[in-house]
Amino acid sequence: MSSEPLQDLRNRLPVLAQTAYLNAGTCGPLAWATADALADGTSRAAVVGRGPAYFEVLVSAHARLRAAYAEALGAEPADVALTTSTTDGLGRVLASLRLQPGDEVVTSTDEHPGLLGPLAALRNLSGVTIRAVPLADVADAVGPATRAVACSHVSWVNGERAPEAALREVGRDIPVIYDGAQGAGAIAVDPASLGCAAYTGAGQKWLCGPVGLGMLWVSRDWADTLRPFALSYGNLAEPARGLDAEPWPDARRFDASAISAEMASAGATATELLADIGWDQVFARSAGLADLLEQTLREGGYEVAPRDRTPLLSVVTPDPPAMRARLADAGVVVRDLPGRPYIRVSTGVWNSEQDLQRLLDVLTA
């Protein structure tokens, strides 16, 4: 990415004026246009009201957001549900499996609480067994009692990728559910080629939208198995039929029930800003910056957690919370991982080599 387009992008993201923002793995930087879309939509609703015209805007905004998320994933809009978070999507699809006592779900030992929470609820409510193994071993851990695999596509701890080829084979027989919080908008996904039953993602991380948005891709091959547990007005093809109303045959049957027009518009605006750059360039530059940082750190004698080619990198430090605070004081935003010896760095297409140097200056001081 040449300097002029990069600077133009950075000018649209006000936090970058003073801050080396390296934390899209938590929340990406908000663009002025995203903030304006949220504010303008809310103001318009306040002034004009939320009558029939508002709901026409809402339907249009949902369609726009669905299309934007689908493009980011490399999917068809009809296969993408709109959710409020990665966890929201995970909860919806796990509940749809209708598992029974004695059934087993395989996951990994380094999962985010956003997946562990729904899995724990599933265990406590349904009596299923949750079996956790290292991410690299999840496919090999599948046994006779396994009814699903639910794991990260990209680990939130170190940027490791799941064993995609092996899980593709597993997915021929049982549903594979990916937590794509660190995948959607960070790397090329193409969920259909992954052979998974469902792929969840977040709108506020690598897609730089407001907190409160996410997506759930659902495979058409698993439509008969993944039946939504809770339905609301927007999930029904003909709501006027009351108890006889059927859900939409496409992914809309999994939509969250209350995503406002202004939120959807803001999320679409954020995602389209990245799409205008070109997703191939977004993915290549984001991972390339992490690769450059890893090389520099290793040459300087620092220990970097094993990772794959993703925009996430975790470096070992003696006191991660203290280092995170030192970096914050210097205008460098990263995060530490509770209970782990790392600070985690997330590099996005919007970052510059100077952002990395500011990080290195504090680490080596």
Q: Which functions belong to the PLM regions below?
A:
Residues M1-A365:
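Pyridoxal 5′-phosphate
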